[in-house]
Amino acid sequence: MAAAATTKKRTQRKKKDPNAPKRAMSAYMFFANENRDIVRAENPGISFGQVGRVLGEKWKALSDDEKQPYEAKAEADKKRYESEKELYNATKAA
């Protein structure tokens, strides 16, 4: 007996508004962007996934004091995003 084939209707995603503000970056993303080239230089020929793994290990190894500058950047970026989003929503609604 053959299994009944079910067909799902695909829902189309909304197109992303190019004028929408970019999302706020996390503290880890600031750290990763700053250290990605260093990790690649220390490990030539490393794959994309391995770079992420090494960065994650380095992030976990940092103390709270060492993470503080990245946390501060993330907080400032979050405020930037919220203010840009507020302005964007106000102009979009008008």
Curated annotation (Swiss-Prot):
GO terms for molecular function: DNA binding. Residues 1-23, 64-94 are annotated as: Disordered. InterPro entries: HMG_box_dom (IPR009071), HMG_box_dom_sf (IPR036910), HMGB (IPR050342). SMART domains: HMG. It comes from Eremothecium gossypii (strain ATCC 10895 / CBS 109.51 / FGSC 9923 / NRRL Y-1056). Residues 21-89 bind DNA. Its main location: nucleus. The keyword DNA repair applies. The gene is NHP6. This is Non-histone chromosomal protein 6. SUPFAM superfamilies: HMG-box (SSF47095).
